[in-house]
Regions:
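Left-handed beta-helix
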Residues: 25-193
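Conserved nucleotide-sugar donor-binding
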Residues: 8-20
Length: 193
């Protein structure tokens, strides 16, 4: 419970979860929390008071804002507390490589990235390539994207496996983030939002 609001999170053992699913199988739609509060039987439901920060991510804009908050060291320290480690799937990739002449500042750059251009105030997932002469600013670039030479990405979220061709400009604004799904682009394209 956060400020007397449910965080809509619950922990249920597998056996109980399967019983709930079987019991409500005929319902067109039923939220797990609704089932726990419903007439399923006598389930012992307890709450846990969480005193840390809770943020909801319900839109592309909130995803962008909350992700970019991680660039603030205070926020990152709260989330990545060594006393509460976050365990994720390990990938066997080399560390990120920064070429001579590249520039990266105030960014989270995951393993396996190759940085030859400029990255500022951005979050790069595993395996992103930023070629020489390319720039990424205030953006979230997901797994295995390639930002080709001369391309410019600003205030954007790119889905994984996108290739931003040479001399392409993708630019949103802080209030109107550009979101690029899996979409092939051609060289010299400009998308401004």
């Amino acid at each position: 419970v956060y400020k007397r609001q449910s965080m809509d999170c619950c922990i249920v053992n597998r056996e109980t979860l399967l019983e709930i699913i079987d019991h409500y199988q005929a319902a067109d739609y039923l939220d797990l929390l609704e089932a726990l509060q419903g007439d399923f039987g006598n389930i012992d439901v307890c709450s846990y008071e969480y005193k840390g920060e809770v943020v909801g991510v319900f839109s592309e804009k909130s995803l962008y804002r909350r992700s970019m908050d991680l660039l603030d060291q205070t926020v990152a320290d709260q989330l990545f507390d060594p006393e509460r480690p976050i365990l994720t799937k390990a990938h066997d990739v080399p560390p990120s490589r920064y070429a001579t002449g590249s520039h990266a500042c105030n960014s989270i750059i995951s393993a396996g990235c190759i940085i030859k251009g400029t990255v500022r105030n951005s979050i790069l997932s595993r395996g992103v390539v930023v070629e020489e002469g390319a720039s990424v600013t205030n953006s979230i670039i997901n797994q295995s994207c390639i930002i080709k030479s001369g391309a410019r990405v600003e205030n954007a979220i790119l889905d994984k496996n996108n290739v931003v061709p040479t001399n392409t400009e993708l630019r949103g604004t802080p209030e109107n983030i550009l979101v690029l799904g899996k979409a092939p682009l051609t060289s010299d394209t400009t998308i401004v939002r």
